[in-house]
A protein has these predicted regions:
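Alpha-helical transmembrane segments of integral membrane proteins
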Residues: 3-11, 64-69, 103-107, 142, ...
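N-terminal signal-anchor transmembrane alpha helix
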Residues: 6-27
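Structured, non-membrane catalytic/scaffold regions adjacent to prosthetic-group chemistry
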Residues: 28, 84, 163-472
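Extracytosolic (periplasmic/ER-lumenal) interhelical loops and adjacent juxtamembrane/interface segments
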Residues: 31-55
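Hydrophobic alpha-helical transmembrane segments
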Residues: 56-81
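N-terminal secretory signal peptides
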Residues: 82-139
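Juxtamembrane/interface segments at transmembrane-helix termini
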Residues: 118-127, 160-170
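N-terminal secretory signal peptides and thylakoid transit peptides that target proteins
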Residues: 132-152
């Protein structure tokens, strides 16, 4: 049995390498599709809570999960190597039907069979036929490899059209941004969270992209990026926050966003009486919805610029929707279609137990002193600084405690750059020698930030940001 292991392993690796090459040309890759299936199946708040407790709030958990999925794929294809090729190849093709369309499944089955035939030596029981059989086996392997190469090229060719739709990103648009006021988050520092591995995020070519607007509309239309940019534009300063951001976490940022008002699109397509919901469709299969009645009271923006420059691929190029007062999960990137529907369609994460409404919770954060370096000099005046944010709720007061909440001092607020932006706050403090527990809370009129600590999943984190600072 173990004599077959090298051949089984080599066949599995060669199949995976050819599949990877085909994927770069646009052909679906089974390990990636398998990873997507597992991600969707395990994408519940409870599972994310476990993942975040182990790997934090970044992409590390997704990266490790993909490595695990790839190893699973290799293990399964290696196991096929211990079966006769006439059994293994059909089993592979049939199994892949659960992950990919039948032409791709068939292609993988055929390529795998040819790999096995090309690598398996021919046997003969006649010593007199040794020379002839050796010649035939070499010729057979050579012909099989030629055929394999032809099939591989055909497989790659089949994906060229699809690959051209998701090829290199075209960012030949406006000039570089000017200097932004204090408090804005540079694009390079803006938080990034995706349901995908970053390498699998859509890479859209502007020349091949259109935004389709259809459903319960009177005049279905499609818009190129150039056509959207020709429409009257708006610029909005808006803080975006991720629903998985923990109390005091880094998954929020303030950007200056430019794009087309959603109301402008509404005027151009007109709605039927049946239109009750907006359903957003993204290039990576992500969907979300919003009641049309709520959209009327919000300044929705179809954004194509961030901080004065075109959106980067990570942040949604060529187009994303921005919805004030909601967490990022309600605001898809890489938009390809806006559908007006008579009934709601639960979004990608909603179907997995996440928040239906995703309203931003009232929150505040201490940015200085640093939580990960909480050491200050005793008897030396400093400014405790941070941000507060409430989505659609204006921040009217921020209080800071230096003794763990026994006493509270009111911080000084800076006027926010817009009604959708976070509020910067500061408090002068001269620490005495020793340990001090800093704590912060924010207010919107009579509404106070929730003190009860709750996990970020599924409705958004609550609680006061607090940590110990040592003064010496």
């Amino acid at each position: 049995m173990f004599k077959r292991l090298p051949l089984a392993l080599f066949s599995a690796v060669l199949l995976s390498v050819l599949g990877g090459l085909a994927w770069w040309a646009g052909v679906l890759y089974p390990p990636i599709e398998l990873n997507g299936v597992l991600t969707r199946a395990l994408g519940t708040p409870e599972m994310f809570r476990i993942i975040h407790s182990i790997f934090g709030v970044g992409q590390d958990g997704k990266n490790i999960a993909f490595v695990g999925t790839t190893l699973l794929w290799l293990a399964l294809t290696v196991a096929l190597g211990f079966l006769p090729v006439l059994l293994a190849a059909p089993l592979l093709g049939l199994g892949l039907l659960f992950l990919v369309p039948w032409p791709v499944a068939l292609g993988y089955g055929v390529v795998y069979a040819l790999i096995r035939l090309a690598l398996t030596p021919f046997k003969t029981n006649s010593s007199r036929a040794t020379l002839a059989s050796t010649s035939l086996s070499r010729a057979g392997r050579r012909n099989a490899l030629v055929t394999l190469g032809g099939v591989g090229v055909a497989l790659l060719g089949a994906g060229i059209t699809r690959g051209s739709r998701t090829g290199a990103v075209d960012l030949t648009l406006p000039s570089a941004p000017g200097k932004l006021p204090t408090g804005f988050t540079p694009v390079k520092d803006f938080f990034y969270v995706s349901k995908n591995l970053e390498i699998l995020d859509p890479k859209i070519k502007a020349a091949n992209w259109t935004l389709e607007v259809n459903g319960e509309v009177q005049r279905p239309q499609s818009f190129t990026l150039e056509e959207l940019r020709a429409l009257p534009s708006q610029t909005v300063d808006l803080t975006l926050a991720c629903i998985s951001n923990p109390v005091g976490g880094p998954l929020l940022g303030l950007g200056r966003w430019t794009g087309v008002s959603f109301a402008e699109i509404l005027k151009r397509v007109g709605l039927t009486a049946n239109a009750k919901w907006i359903v957003w469709h993204a290039a990576d299969g992500y969907t979300e919805s919003l009641p049309l009645s709520e959209a009327a009271s919000l300044e929705l923006l179809l954004a194509y610029e961030q901080n004065g420059a075109p959106l980067t691929p990570k942040h949604g190029f060529p187009l994303r929707i921005l919805i004030p007062g909601r967490y990022g999960m309600k605001q898809p990137r890489w938009l390809t279609r806006i559908e007006f529907a008579a009934e709601d369609r639960a979004g990608y994460w909603v179907t997995r137990g996440w928040s239906k409404t995703a309203f931003v919770e009232l929150t505040s954060r201490i940015d200085f002193p640093l939580e990960n370096s909480p050491v200050v000099k005793a008897a030396q005046p400093i400014q405790i600084e941070g941000i507060a944010f409430g989505g659609l709720l204006p921040i009217t007061k921020v209080e800071v405690s230096t003794d763990g909440g026994q006493n509270w001092l009111e911080a000084q607020l800076e006027k926010p750059v817009s009604k959708y932006a976070w509020t910067l706050w500061s408090l002068p403090w001269t620490p005495e020698a020793g340990s001090h527990e800093l704590k912060v809370r924010s207010y919107s009129s009579e509404k106070v930030q929730k003190e009860q600590e709750e996990d970020a999943l599924p409705e958004g984190a609550t609680g006061y940001h607090h940590f110990i600072v040592n003064a010496s």
